[in-house]
UniProtKB/Swiss-Prot annotation:
Originating gene: WNT-10
Family matches, as InterPro entries: Wnt, Wnt_C
Key words of the record: Developmental protein, Disulfide bond, Extracellular matrix, Lipoprotein, Secreted, Wnt signaling pathway
One GO term describing the cellular component: extracellular space
One protein family per Pfam: wnt
SS bonds (residue pairs): C79-C94
Record PTM: Palmitoleoylation is required for efficient binding to frizzled receptors. Depalmitoleoylation leads to Wnt signaling pathway inhibition.
GO MF terms held by the record: cytokine activity; frizzled binding
Name this protein carries in UniProt: Protein Wnt-10
Lineage: Eukaryota, Metazoa, Chordata, Craniata, Vertebrata
Length: 113
């Protein structure tokens, strides 16, 4: 009949937070697959799923000083007691424990009422 139709399709990226949450879940469940030097193949019986992240070398802990990678470590650094993330004491102190220092100061403030 001589008429034509126009169809437009597009894809929208998912919410940024959901992408981050998915990546974190995949990172936390990533599978370590050591390579066998003699055969050049993957060792063991672990077979990753198609959607699973894998890694072949363990990451440094960054807790101890490692000069070859330029990491000063975390020993002696101040941590944030109330933080839950990387700057928090449980993460930053790497299980070595930490000291809590409480101070009470009495100072003259020269306040006038």
């Amino acid at each position: 009949s001589g008429s034509c139709q126009l169809k437009t399709c597009w894809q929208v990226s998912p919410d940024f937070r959901s992408v981050g949450d998915t990546l974190r879940e995949k990172f936390q469940s990533a599978l370590f697959l050591p390579l066998h030097n003699g055969h050049g193949g993957i060792g063991g019986l672990l077979v990753p799923r198609d959607t699973q992240l894998v890694y072949f070398e363990r990451s440094p802990t960054f807790c101890e000083q490692e000069d070859d990678i330029g990491s000063p470590g975390t020993r002696g650094r101040l941590c944030e007691r109330t933080e839950q993330g990387f700057s928090g004491c449980s993460s930053m102190c790497c299980g070595r424990g930490h000291n809590v220092v409480r101070e009470t100061r009495v100072e003259r403030c020269n306040c006038k009422f």
